[in-house]
Amino acid sequence: EDTELKTLLDCAIVQALERIEESMSLEGDAIHKVLSDSMVVISEDVNSIEGTLENYRSELFTSMNKRISELLTNHKMDNMEQRLVQELAIYIDKYDVQEEITRLQSHIDTFRNTIAPNDNTDIGKTLNFIVQEMQREANTLGSKYSTSQSFKYILNIKEEIEKCREIVQNVS
């Protein structure tokens, strides 16, 4: 009787553990899909922003060149033209976001590689760090490149990163 009860109890425990493991696996698959989908959205938005950069640089240069020309004409400072052109180049470089875009793309790749199926079971801290870095780059991108055209992409990137941050807080 005790042996029979022990066998039934052992069987019930094994079944319960199998169900827990199956449930955890399904939850892990669902989390993986959400995180992967977010990386797709972020990547597409980063690529969209990158596609607008050349036009942005050109518009910025044209606008600043016009303003400088007006200043030179109105203030008769012809000897300052070369210096102003140099300042314009520095200004444009200051607002260049290619570096942030490149780093964001690198973080996306690292995130994807980290969540790829492998034997690494302790990825929560790594993902949290990557998400923090992505948020930092997105914030810098938003402060340097705030146009009406880029606003929706940057906002969407930040929302997706925040969604990922909330999820990875619970990943071990």
Task: Please identify what each model-predicted range represents.
Residues 1-172:
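N-terminal intrinsically disordered, cationic/polar leader segments
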